[in-house]
Amino acid sequence: MEQRDYYELLEVSRNASDAEIKKAYRRLAMKYHPDRNPGDTSAEEKFKEIQKAYNILSDKQKRAAYDQFGHAGVDPSMGGGPGGFGGFGGFGDVFEDIFENIFSGGRGQGRQSRGQRGADLQFNVQLTLEEAAIGKEVEITVPRHGTCTVCEGSGAKKGTSPKTCETCQGMGQVRIQQGFFSIQQTCPTCHGEGKIISDPCASCHGQGRVRESKKINVKIPAGVDNGDRVRLSGEGEAGVHGGGSGDLYVQISLKKHAIFERHENDLHCEVPISFATAALGGSIEVPTLEGRVTLKIPAETQTGKVFRLRSKGMKSVRGYGQGDLLCKVVVETPVNLSREQKELLNKLQDSLENAKGTHSPKTSSWFAGVKKFFEDMKF
């Protein structure tokens, strides 16, 4: 199946800035999130495509590879790497060697071997709506590879240091001449590291990192929503042999609330009112995330009427603006009536039926429609 262009998926231009890409992702992820489109498989598939596109375009190295080679540059199944030639077996090294010579000015000496960057990690944190509204600082324990404190990440025994590999002169790769081709291969002596550790650290066994459980305090800003991520630079996996550490992404999810439903920064709720309050009007108390407020109900209010309370919703995670609280009133039908109450209601019903103009506009319109329906029917 043909893959869609990642820039097209995020609805941005190819020269879009990182901020524009992030803004587009947040908008589209919010629109197609499965929680907001229950049972909609097309929305779920769109959400997955948007996530994949953002994962590529938000990473500078992956974005550069995608800009140069398209999907083949970032999808291993289409070629096995940025060059897109991994699927050709042994010829992958041949073409890699050609590109190496082109982009290095024909020096033919390869790249200086350097440490490998640590992997990025993701940690999921679940918050209540109340916590998301005001922000929260949480302590998390992240299992990861951390830098070995004994050798300080070098992998060598304390007091010693790794030596440059004599076979590849620290390049991590060697060239082998086969006919007309000069093939570049991983150095068999240092296995691509460029250095030899003759006396490895006993604590990390020469890896420069060890398993640990790191406690980290995370400040989660007010206004976060499902799918938002907090990035902690350098708190991911430690790099190998001096490589930089990866990043930690704290993924936010919100617990379902008993009263409120969130739609972007607005909150929605249903408020039950009595038949008498709906007919005669009155005041009721409604809950907000900041406490109780009084809502005035005008006379002759119909069930389903929505009242908007300004700035009683969620704060914007960007630090400006606040959503509203939308209260939908539901007129309750009384139950478990006494004989006296039933008699009073019967009297009220008789009184209303004999009076004109007491039906709501919706009811009057419905009765008029039913009357016309029967008049037009031919039995």
Swiss-Prot record:
Cell compartment(s), UniProt: Cytoplasm
SMART domains: DnaJ
Cofactor descriptive note: Binds 2 Zn(2+) ions per monomer.
Keywords, ordered alphabetically: Chaperone, Cytoplasm, DNA replication, Metal-binding, Repeat, Stress response, Zinc, Zinc-finger
UniProt entry tagged with the keyword rRNA-binding: no
Zinc finger (CR-type): 135-213
Pfam families in the record: DnaJ, DnaJ_C, DnaJ_CXXCXGXG
Domain J: 5-70
Main location as per UniProt: cytoplasm
Intrachain S-S bonds: none
Gene Ontology annotations of biological process type: chaperone cofactor-dependent protein refolding; DNA replication; protein refolding; response to heat
Cofactor (UniProt): Zn(2+)
Gene Ontology CC terms, in alphabetical order: cytoplasm
Record-listed Zn(2+) 1 binding positions: C148, C151, C201, C204
An example Gene Ontology molecular-function term: heat shock protein binding
SUPFAM superfamilies (UniProt xref): Chaperone J-domain, DnaJ/Hsp40 cysteine-rich domain, HSP40/DnaJ peptide-binding domain
InterPro entries documented for this protein: DnaJ (IPR012724), DnaJ_C (IPR002939), DnaJ_domain (IPR001623), DnaJ_domain_CS (IPR018253), HSP40/DnaJ_pept-bd (IPR008971), HSP_DnaJ_Cys-rich_dom (IPR001305), HSP_DnaJ_Cys-rich_dom_sf (IPR036410), J_dom_sf (IPR036869)
Family: Belongs to the DnaJ family.
Protein task: Participates actively in the response to hyperosmotic and heat shock by preventing the aggregation of stress-denatured proteins and by disaggregating proteins, also in an autonomous, DnaK-independent fashion. Unfolded proteins bind initially to DnaJ; upon interaction with the DnaJ-bound protein, DnaK hydrolyzes its bound ATP, resulting in the formation of a stable complex. GrpE releases ADP from DnaK; ATP binding to DnaK triggers the release of the substrate protein, thus completing the reaction cycle.
Subunit structure, as described in the record: Homodimer.
Comment on protein domains: The J domain is necessary and sufficient to stimulate DnaK ATPase activity. Zinc center 1 plays an important role in the autonomous, DnaK-independent chaperone activity of DnaJ. Zinc center 2 is essential for interaction with DnaK and for DnaJ activity.
Protein name per Swiss-Prot or TrEMBL: Chaperone protein DnaJ
Organism: Legionella pneumophila (strain Lens)
Organism placement in taxonomy: Bacteria, Pseudomonadati, Pseudomonadota, Gammaproteobacteria, Legionellales
